[in-house]
A protein has these predicted regions:
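Amphipathic alpha-helical assembly/interaction segments
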Residues: 1-176
Length: 176
């Protein structure tokens, strides 16, 4: 029924092989290891309970932000509409920037392995370059009007008339 439509969509395996997904996965794995280090390290036992909790929270937040990147890449690659791709791209960018901020937070709360944070920052910078090139591939003319006005292609406004509104549609004559 939807074979023609589905043939243009990338499979999960195809998505996982893309450079941007691979880099997003590397970011997650590194953030996950950092969070585990904070959880397991005995060297944080000397911290007061509140400081330790802040460090643990910051590490879990870092992991959570990194965890959002790959699913949103899949979401953007799984569809063709510009506005939905851009919505996912904005969430990816936000998550990647939060990972960068999270590295600073971990330093602030006393994370003992700054070399891992530097590695993570380097991964995010490499990801940023891949991301900037990737979003250039989005087809700006394959869109629906975003009535919120946030993810429309250049020159399209939230209150523009949708040309699809002029297409005749008879719900009683719709094949099921």
């Amino acid at each position: 029924m939807f074979d023609e439509e589905d043939s243009s969509r990338k499979s999960h395996e195809e998505i996982r092989k893309t450079p941007i997904f691979k880099k997003g996965w590397q970011i997650f794995k590194l953030a996950d290891k950092i969070a585990e280090l904070v959880k397991e390290e005995e060297e944080y036992e000397h911290l007061q309970e509140m400081e330790r909790n802040l460090l643990l929270h910051q590490a879990e937040q870092l992991r959570g932000d990194a965890m959002m990147i790959c699913p949103k890449i899949s979401g953007a690659m799984g569809g063709e509409l510009y506005d939905l791709k851009m919505e996912n791209a904005a969430l990816i960018r936000k998550s990647a920037r939060e990972v960068q901020t999270g590295c600073s937070g971990l330093e602030l709360w006393g994370f003992k392995h700054p070399e891992y944070l530097e590695l993570l920052r380097d991964e995010v910078e490499e990801f940023r370059l891949l991301f900037a090139e990737w979003i250039k591939t989005f087809d700006v003319w394959n869109y629906t009007i975003d009535r919120w006005g946030l993810f429309n292609p250049p020159g399209i406004n939230y209150d523009d008339k949708d040309p699809d509104d002029d297409l005749p549609f008879d719900p009683d004559n719709f094949p099921i």
